[in-house]
Amino acid sequence: MASHQDQSYKAGEPKGHAQEKTGQMADTMKDKAQAAKDKASEMAGSARDRTVESKDQTGSYVSDKAGAVKDKTCETAQAAKEKTGGAMQATKEKASEMGESAKETAVAGKEKTGGLMSSAAEQVKGMAQGATEAVKNTFGMAGADEEEKTTTTRVTRSSARTE
């Protein structure tokens, strides 16, 4: 029986070696799988960290650019407001100057017209008196004193203009 046990022992020996070898290979595979898992996890964490950092940088960049755009817009709006205010002031001043000029022109026109009207009134008055005297003389209604005083006065336009 000893030989049967030897045979059985010898038959079990390769089986044990195979099991041991399989166990070692399984352990090696487990170790490699765990190492690959750890490395993948580490890479994923690193990628996540880089993504978060990139997002923060991008957010900061976008925020900075948005702030710059906002500042530029405010500056442009302020400049437009100031320019409009200046244009309005210039328009007010020009309108005031034009109003003053129109007033001066109206006063000068009134004075000139008043002078012409006064001159024309004097001419009409003189002609009316001359016509009255002529009619009186024609009908013999003028007295002796009036006939001597009456002289025909002729007023011409050129003399009226020079007055």
UniProtKB/Swiss-Prot annotation:
Which stretches are sequence repeats? 32-42, 43-53, 65-75, 76-86, 87-97, 103-115
Biased composition of type Low complexity is found at: 152-163
Residue stretches of biased makeup (Basic and acidic residues): 28-56, 67-84, 91-113
Q: Cite the residue spans of the region called 6 X 11 AA approximate repeats.
A: 32-115
Is Nucleotide-binding among the key words of this record? no
Keywords assigned: Repeat
One GO cellular component term: nucleus
The segment annotated Disordered runs over: 1-117, 139-163
This protein's source sits in the domain of life called: Eukaryota
Matches recorded under PANTHER family: DAUER UP-REGULATED-RELATED, RE19971P
Q: Spell out the family assignment given in the record's similarity comment.
A: Belongs to the LEA type 4 family.
Any idea what this protein is called? Late embryogenesis abundant protein Dc3
Q: What is the lineage of its organism?
A: Eukaryota, Viridiplantae, Streptophyta, Embryophyta, Tracheophyta
